[in-house]
């Protein structure tokens, strides 16, 4: 029996006994083979495997999809109504907001279908079909059509996906997008046929004082009182097929929608989550965990924190800027705080010690097996990481500063083409490139960009980058700053933001009226952009083949861990594909003398209220409803109104918006966060500390009905009392 088959058998055999209780981001298509369905039933599930995932029929899988490009959403009515998180819909809410119509502050409630807002660029994606293509890939390797490392490259897999799609019965059907992906570090491969609906409209969103209550302070924290939800609707053509926005489109008649339970929950109740976890790294070695901490998290924390201070000051001073930068700030601060929490949790939870123990056990196993590949693999990973870490640190600093931090710049490649056209006096090429420049100018100076705010960001980040990266390793602009501006960063930034061709409308109009080679050569923003891209390319060249080498080493290491038959997870790392995690409603104790119960109520909202702090403002109407205890049928038997609850489910980024389901597959909540103490969970799952923070569906319905006046939406839903 070859090693790959032995490894795959080990995966199946380990499934029942290997993963700790509640740990696991399980592949739907392997539930029966790996016996995970049996474990779910032992914990309380009352459904069969085909109720969750049925390749030949309709199942719960068909009510769950990808919301936008990085979240999960679920269908909660036969009319294509989507429930997801407020923070998942935040970009769309911000997109529709203005000082005159401030939906971020005031909320948005569509009182009828014709009031639902088209949201250009927003899509909802269902998984139509999943196929195992491992044998196809392995045959290509055996035939030497590709190398082993090429087998899990996006170049090969995208080409293979297109090839298989061309032979599929789904070819020619509207909205189908094929995707082939590696699993278990390239030991398994699956093909996903996705159905993408591009007409998604905004239906409901509470005010940010509900949807983001607690803000940055409460993010990743428990106890939680955030009403983190928003609602959208899928529209389709008259045949129910995907179609770009049209006034004639109609709400999608969905194959499946989730029933909603308001029966309540108690400690120990079964809870499962279906969704699209984005990325985990559960199989890292000690050296790789250290690299994550020092080369990725640490510089990200420092650079984002500095930028966010600038943005926050500007946002507090202007409602216009607050709306412009709301989504940018939220996206930045989310993983800024995550990085802080991850580094702290790695230390507090002794993740390095746990990984070292695993490596020691693996070394013993490899020696007993007399397997040279296994005996050497960790040392080879460590050698590679010693080379990648300093480069990765530079890459993080570069991308966080110049690509994720400072927005202004110039399309130097377009400028080069225009310069060449001017030199050759090629009128058609000049006209074509100026047309592109006009598009770029409008793209830079879009409604969510403030040139003066970005100027302040640049003045803060350019000197910070110089502190973090030694001379000789920085982009070439630092030589210019030193020589031509005598090290004065503010003077350099002002020159770029005042005099560059794309800096403002007057400069741009003057240039396109009479473009010259000299103006392009002197343009500071063009020089700046070229320098940052040159440095990016230089670092990629330094990294060279090291990522491919590490990928192959990981394939060996993970195969060996499977064969070792240790209590290791038998599920692959998350890669934004559909997964299922099961567990229970459960409290936790993060440290001696501290005990957190498993749910919160609206009492905590009033306890946290602070009218002087934007993060803890309570809307007057909500406060009135709470004080009057006007909760309707959604209250607990004792009269309290539940807000959030904890479960032991295994989630990560991408699961935001995922449905939390009870033993009958009924919706009881919407997952939206993890707890602070377990932020090392992407690297190592800790059963005692890992908790998923969920929004109670009863609070969603209460806000929708009592505050939003959206009884018509509730009437669409199937409510189980």
Swiss-Prot record:
GO terms for biological process: peptide catabolic process; proteolysis. The active site is at 87 (charge relay system), 228 (charge relay system), 656 (charge relay system). Residues 1-21 form the signal peptide. Pfam families: Peptidase_S46. It comes from the Bacteria. InterPro entries: Pep_S46 (IPR019500), Peptidase_S1_PA (IPR009003), Peptidase_S1_PA_chymotrypsin (IPR043504). GO terms for molecular function: dipeptidyl-peptidase activity; serine-type aminopeptidase activity. It is an enzyme of class 3 (hydrolase). Transmembrane segments: none annotated. Its EC number is 3.4.14.-. Catalyzes the removal of dipeptides from the N-terminus of oligopeptides. Most potently cleaves the synthetic substrate Met-Leu-methylcoumaryl-7-amide (Met-Leu-MCA), followed by Leu-Arg-, and to a much lesser extent Lys-Ala-, Leu-Asp-, Leu-Glu-, Leu-Lys, and Val-Arg-MCA, while this enzyme does not hydrolyze Gly-Arg-, Gly-Gly-, Lys-Lys-, or Gly-Pro-MCA. Belongs to the peptidase S46 family. This is Dipeptidyl-peptidase 7. It comes from Bacteroides fragilis (strain ATCC 25285 / DSM 2151 / CCUG 4856 / JCM 11019 / LMG 10263 / NCTC 9343 / Onslow / VPI 2553 / EN-2).
């Amino acid at each position: 029996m070859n090693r790959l088959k032995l490894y795959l058998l080990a995966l199946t055999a380990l499934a029942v006994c290997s993963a700790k209780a509640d740990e696991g981001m399980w592949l739907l298509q392997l539930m029966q083979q790996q016996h995970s369905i049996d474990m779910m039933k032992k914990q309380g599930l009352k459904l069969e495997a085909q109720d969750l995932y049925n390749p030949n029929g309709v199942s719960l899988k068909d009510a769950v999809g990808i919301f936008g490009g990085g979240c999960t959403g679920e269908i909660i009515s036969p009319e294509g109504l989507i429930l997801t998180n407020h923070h998942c819909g935040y970009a769309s809410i911000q997109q529709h907001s203005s000082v005159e119509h401030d939906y971020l502050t005031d909320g948005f409630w569509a009182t009828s279908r014709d009031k639902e807002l088209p949201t250009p660029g927003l899509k909802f994606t269902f998984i139509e079909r999943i196929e195992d293509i491992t044998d196809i890939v392995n045959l290509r390797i055996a035939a030497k059509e590709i190398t082993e490392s090429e087998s899990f490259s996006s170049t090969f897999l995208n080409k293979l996906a297109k090839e298989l799609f061309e032979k599929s019965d789904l070819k020619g059907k509207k909205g189908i997008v094929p995707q082939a992906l590696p699993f278990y570090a390239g030991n398994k491969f699956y093909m996903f046929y996705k159905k993408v609906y591009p007409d998604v409209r905004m239906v409901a969103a509470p005010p940010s004082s509900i949807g983001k209550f607690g803000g940055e302070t409460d993010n990743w924290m428990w106890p939680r009182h955030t009403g983190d939800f928003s609602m959208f609707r899928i529209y389709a053509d008259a045949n129910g097929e995907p179609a770009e926005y049209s006034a004639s489109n109609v709400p999608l008649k969905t194959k499946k929608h989730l029933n909603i339970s308001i029966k309540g929950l108690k400690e120990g109740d079964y809870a499962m989550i279906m969704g699209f976890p984005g990325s985990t790294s559960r199989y890292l070695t000690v050296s790789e965990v250290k690299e994550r901490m020092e080369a990725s998290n640490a510089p990200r924390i420092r650079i984002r924190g500095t930028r966010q201070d600038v943005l926050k000051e500007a946002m507090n001073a202007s409602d216009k800027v607050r709306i412009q930068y709301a989504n940018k700030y939220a996206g930045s601060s989310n993983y800024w705080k995550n990085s802080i929490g991850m580094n702290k949790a790695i230390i507090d939870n002794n993740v390095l010690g746990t990984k070292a123990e695993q490596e020691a056990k693996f070394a013993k196993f490899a020696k007993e097996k007399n397997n040279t590949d296994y005996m050497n693999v960790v040392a080879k990973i460590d050698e590679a990481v010693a080379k990648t870490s300093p480069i990765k640190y530079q890459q993080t600093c570069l991308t966080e500063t110049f690509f994720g931090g400072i927005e202004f710049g110039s399309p130097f490649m377009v400028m080069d083409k225009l310069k060449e056209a001017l030199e050759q006096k090629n009128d058609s090429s000049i006209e074509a490139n100026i047309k592109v420049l006009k598009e770029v100018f409008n793209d830079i100076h879009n409604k969510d960009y403030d040139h003066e705010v970005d100027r302040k960001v640049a003045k803060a980040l350019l000197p910070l980058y110089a502190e973090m990266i030694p001379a000789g390793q920085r982009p070439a602009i630092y030589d210019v700053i030193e020589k031509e501006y005598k090290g004065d960063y503010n003077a350099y930034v002002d020159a770029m933001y005042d005099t560059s061709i794309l800096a403002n409308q007057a400069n741009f109009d003057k240039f396109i009226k009479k473009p010259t080679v000299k103006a392009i050569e002197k343009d500071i923003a063009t020089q700046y952009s070229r320098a940052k891209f040159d440095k990016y390319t230089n670092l990629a060249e330094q990294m060279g083949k090291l990522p491919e080498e590490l990928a192959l080493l990981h394939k060996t290491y993970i195969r060996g861990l499977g064969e070792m038959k240790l209590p290791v997870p038998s599920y692959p790392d998350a890669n934004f594909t559909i997964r299922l995690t099961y567990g229970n409603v459960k409290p936790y104790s993060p440290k001696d003398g501290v005990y957190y119960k498993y749910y919160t109520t609206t009492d905590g909202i009033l306890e946290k209220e602070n009218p002087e702090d934007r993060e803890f403002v309570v809307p007057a109407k909500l406060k009135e409803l709470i004080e009057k205890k006007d909760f309707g049928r959604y209250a607990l038997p004792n009269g309290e109104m539940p807000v959030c609850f904890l479960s032991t489910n295994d989630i990560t980024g991408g699961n935001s918006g995922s449905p939390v389901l009870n033993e009958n597959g009924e919706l009881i909540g919407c997952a939206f966060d993890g707890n602070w103490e377990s932020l090392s969970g992407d690297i190592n799952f800790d059963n005692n500390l890992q908790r998923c923070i969920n929004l109670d569906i009863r609070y969603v319905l209460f806000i929708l009905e009592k505050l939003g006046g959206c009884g018509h939406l509730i009437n669409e839903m199937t409510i189980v009392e």
